[in-house]
Swiss-Prot record:
Residues 604-619 have a biased composition (Low complexity). Induction: By stress conditions e.g. heat shock. Keywords: ATP-binding, Chaperone, Nucleotide-binding, Phosphoprotein, Stress response. Acts as a chaperone. It comes from the Bacteria. GO terms for molecular function: ATP binding; ATP-dependent protein folding chaperone; unfolded protein binding. It comes from Pseudomonas entomophila (strain L48). Coiled coil: none annotated. The modification Phosphothreonine is found at residue 199. PANTHER family: HEAT SHOCK PROTEIN 70KDA. This is Chaperone protein DnaK.
Length: 641
C-alpha cells in the first residue's frame, strides 16, 4: 500500500507532509518552497495556474485569480460575511442555483470545493514527485470549528482531486500531534492557539502516556470560522485606501487592478512589521486620472498596524476563555502554549496570548508546517506504520433535533469525544399522525430557530395511533471525520429512514457567534424560552385531554358544564398562541377548575363499575417516561415529491 500523505489545506497557504523513518517530513514543491499559496488562476489560454505562479500574475489578471476560497466553502451566498467579502475581493462571488456561494472565473461558475481541489492536486503532485510513486490517499485538516457541511465540502474537494480522504482531522489536534510525538513521556496539558489565514481555533488537549501509548485527547475546542490573517490584511488595505483618498480624492476600491496590488503590498507590509518598527508602502502608478498617473506612498508604523487590528486580536481571547471553561481547566494548569498559523508571528498576537495564559508560547513549533506534519502522523497511524498513538477528538458544536414547541433537544453535546453514537425515543404530537419530519440542528441555543439547520427528512407510514403512543427512535452517529449520520426508526414496524447530513451551507460569522456565545449571555433568554415552551406544551396537552374526556363522557356532561369547559378551552388555545407564560398558566388553572367536576364524576362512575374485591386498575393512557414529545409535521401524500 502507498503512503498516506498529510495535507494542511489552508486559506492562505497549503502544505504537504509524509512520515519517513518515523519522522514527519514537509515536502518542498516544484518551486523549492515548503508551503504553497492557496491561489488558483485561470489564464486566457485556458491554463490553470496554482500557487506561486498564480500569485505572480494576480496583478495583471485580478478577475480570474482566486484566493482565500476556503472562507466560502460550505457557505450560503446570502450570508452577511459572504456579502462583506464580495466588496473586498477583485474576483466575482456568485449565487449558485442551490443558494451556495460560488466563484466565477473565465466566465465559468465554480463551487469552492472545485477550486480547493486544484490546490489539493498540486499537493498530491508535489508528494508524488518526491516519493516517486502514485499517491491516492490523504489525511486533510480542517479548522476545529468547521461545521458538518464545511467538512463535507472539504471531503468533496479531496475526491475531486483524486484522493481517497482517509480522515478529516482538526488543525489544532494535528499541530498537537506534531508537537507531542517527540516530547518526554508523562502527562501534560497544552493549548493550541491556531490563527491562520482565514480561520481561528483554540483547543485544550491532554497528552498522556497510557500503557506505553501516546494518547492525545481533546478536552474542548472553540473558535471563529471567519477570523484570520486575511482580516488583518483587509484592515491595512482599508487604511491605505482611505489615506490615498484623502490625498487624491480617488477611491481605489472600485479598481480591481489597484485592489490586487494593494492586497499584495498590505500582506508584505504586515509581515515586515513583525520584525521592523515601520515600513513604507510604495506603489507607483497605482491609478490615473485626467491629470496623469497617481502614486501611492504611505509610511506605516507597527503601532499603527496594532491600532488597526487591536479588536481582531481581542476577539480571539473570548474563545480561549470558553475553551478553558468547557474543559474545566484553569489557565495556570496549562503546561505549554503552541502557536499555529502564520498570523501568530505578529508580536501583538504573541503578547496577547502570553498575557492571557500567563506564559510565553513555545518557539520550537513551526506555525506554518506543524498542521501538515500532524496530518502525516495521523496518516501513518491509519496505515498501521505508527502503532503507539491514539487520537481522541471532539465534536465542536451541540447536535440535536427540533421537538415540540420549537425547542432544540440535544442528542450529542458539544465537546463530546468522537466517534460517538446516541439514540433517544420521541413520539408523535397528533392522533393518527402518519409521518414525522426529523429536523436536524447544530448549535448551542435552546430555541430551534436560533440554531443552524443541517437538514430534514421524513419517516412515513407510521400506523394510526393516539398521540404519544408511537415510539420513534432517533439515532445520531458522528464518524471519526466529525461527519454526522442520522437515522429514525418506528419501533413498532421496524421501518427506518436514514441520511448522511449534507447541508448546502456553512455557518456565518453571526451564526457562529450566536451559537457559541456562552450561557452567561443567553442563559436568561433561553430559560424564559424553555419555560414558555413547557407552558405551551402543558396547555396543548390539557386541551387535548379535556376534549377527549368531554367526548367520552357524552350526555353525562350537562349543557352548562359543556359551555363553561368549551369557553375555557378556547381561552387556553388563544393564550397558547401568545408569548405570555403567566397568561397560559392562568388559563390552564381556569380550565382545570371548570373541568374538575366532570373529571370527578367520570372517576366516581369508573370506580362504581369495577368488580368488588381486588379491583383492577383501569389501564392508563399509553405513556412512556423515556418518550420526549416531538413536534413533527405530517407529510401529506399529495405533497410528496
Amino acid at each position: 500500500m502507498g503512503k498516506i500523505i498529510g495535507i494542511d489545506l489552508g486559506t492562505t497557504n497549503s502544505c504537504v507532509s509524509v512520515l519517513e523513518n518515523g519522522t514527519a517530513k514537509v515536502i518542498e514543491n516544484a518551486e523549492g518552497a515548503r508551503t504553497t499559496p492557496s491561489i488558483i488562476a485561470y489564464a486566457n489560454d485556458g491554463e490553470i495556474l496554482v500557487g506561486q505562479s498564480a500569485k505572480r500574475q494576480a496583478v495583471t489578471n485580478p478577475h480570474n485569480t482566486l484566493f482565500a476560497v476556503k472562507r466560502l466553502i460550505g457557505r450560503r451566498f446570502d450570508e452577511e460575511v459572504v456579502q462583506k467579502d464580495i466588496k473586498l475581493v477583485p474576483y466575482k462571488i456568485v449565487k449558485a442555483s442551490n443558494g451556495d456561494a460560488w466563484v466565477q472565473a473565465s466566465g465559468k461558475d465554480m463551487a469552492p470545493p472545485q477550486i480547493s481541489a486544484e490546490v489539493l492536486k498540486k499537493m498530491k503532485k508535489t508528494a508524488e514527485d518526491y516519493l516517486g510513486e502514485p499517491v491516492t490517499e490523504a489525511v486533510i485538516t480542517v479548522p476545529a470549528y468547521f461545521n458538518d457541511s464545511q467538512r463535507q465540502a472539504t471531503k468533496d474537494a479531496g475526491r475531486i482531486a483524486g484522493l481517497d480522504v482517509k480522515r478529516i482531522i482538526n488543525e489544532p489536534t494535528a499541530a498537537a500531534l506534531a508537537y507531542g510525538m517527540d516530547k518526554a513521556k508523562g502527562d501534560h496539558t497544552v493549548i493550541v492557539y491556531d490563527l491562520g489565514g482565514g480561520t481561528f481555533d483554540v483547543s485544550v488537549i491532554e497528552i498522556a502516556e497510557v500503557d506505553g501509548e501516546h494518547q492525545f485527547e481533546v478536552l474542548a475546542t472553540n473558535g471563529d470560522t471567519f477570523l484570520g490573517g486575511e482580516d488583518f490584511d483587509m484592515r491595512l488595505i482599508d487604511y491605505l485606501v482611505d489615506e490615498f483618498k484623502k490625498e487624491s480624492g480617488m477611491d481605489l476600491k472600485n479598481d480591481p487592478l489597484a485592489l490586487q496590488r494593494l492586497k499584495e503590498a498590505a500582506e508584505k507590509a504586515k509581515i515586515e512589521l513583525s520584525s521592523a518598527q515601520s515600513t513604507d508602502v510604495n506603489l507607483p502608478y497605482i491609478t490615473a486620472d485626467a491629470t496623469g498617473p497617481k502614486h501611492l506612498n504611505v509610511k506605516i508604523s507597527r503601532a499603527k498596524l496594532e491600532a488597526l487590528v487591536e479588536d481582531l486580536v481581542t476577539r480571539t481571547i473570548e474563545p480561549c476563555r470558553i475553551a478553558l471553561k468547557d474543559a474545566g481547566i484553569d489557565a495556570s494548569k496549562i503546561d505549554d502554549v503552541i502557536l499555529v498559523g502564520g498570523q501568530t508571528r505578529m508580536p501583538m498576537v504573541q503578547k496577547a496570548v502570553a498575557d492571557f495564559f500567563g506564559k510565553e508560547a513555545r518557539k520550537d513549533v513551526n506555525p506554518d508546517e506543524a498542521v501538515a506534519m500532524g496530518a502525516a502522523i495521523q496518516g501513518a497511524v491509519l496505515a498501521g506504520d505508527v502503532k503507539d498513538v491514539l487520537l481522541l477528538d471532539v465534536s465542536p458544536l451541540t447536535l440535536g433535533i427540533e421537538t415540540m414547541g420549537g425547542v432544540m433537544t440535544a442528542l450529542i453535546e458539544k465537546n463530546t469525544t468522537i466517534p460517538t453514537k446516541k439514540s433517544q425515543v420521541f413520539s408523535t404530537a397528533d392522533d393518527n399522525q402518519g409521518a414525522v419530519t426529523i429536523h436536524v440542528l447544530q448549535g448551542e441555543r435552546k430555541q430551534a430557530s436560533q440554531n443552524k439547520s443541517l437538514g430534514k427528512f421524513d419517516l412515513a407510514d407510521i400506523p394510526p395511533a393516539p398521540r404519544g403512543v408511537p415510539q420513534i427512535e432517533v439515532t445520531f452517529d458522528i464518524d471519526a471525520n466529525g461527519i454526522l449520520h442520522v437515522g429514525a426508526k418506528d419501533k413498532a414496524t421496524g421501518k427506518a429512514q436514514s441520511i448522511v447530513i449534507k447541508a448546502n451551507s456553512g455557518l456565518s460569522d453571526e451564526e457562529v457567534e450566536r451559537m457559541v456565545r456562552d450561557a452567561e449571555a443567553n442563559a436568561e433568554e433561553d430559560r424564559k424560552f424553555e419555560e414558555l415552551a413547557a407552558a405551551r406544551n402543558q396547555g396543548d396537552a390539557l386541551v387535548h385531554s379535556t376534549r377527549k374526556m368531554v367526548a367520552d363522557a357524552g350526555d353525562k356532561v350537562t349543557a352548562e358544564e359543556k359551555t363553561a369547559i368549551e369557553a375555557a378551552v378556547v381561552a387556553l388555545e388563544a393564550a397558547v398562541k401568545g408569548d405570555d407564560k403567566a397568561a397560559i398558566d392562568a388559563k390552564v388553572e381556569e380550565l382545570s377548575k371548570v373541568s374538575a367536576p366532570v373529571a370527578q364524576k367520570m372517576y366516581a362512575e369508573q370506580q362504581a363499575e369495577q368488580p368488588q374485591g381486588g379491583a383492577q386498575q383501569a389501564e392508563p393512557e399509553a405513556k412512556h417516561d423515556d418518550v420526549v414529545d416531538a413536534e413533527f409535521e405530517e407529510v401529506k401524500d399529495n405533497n410528496k415529491q
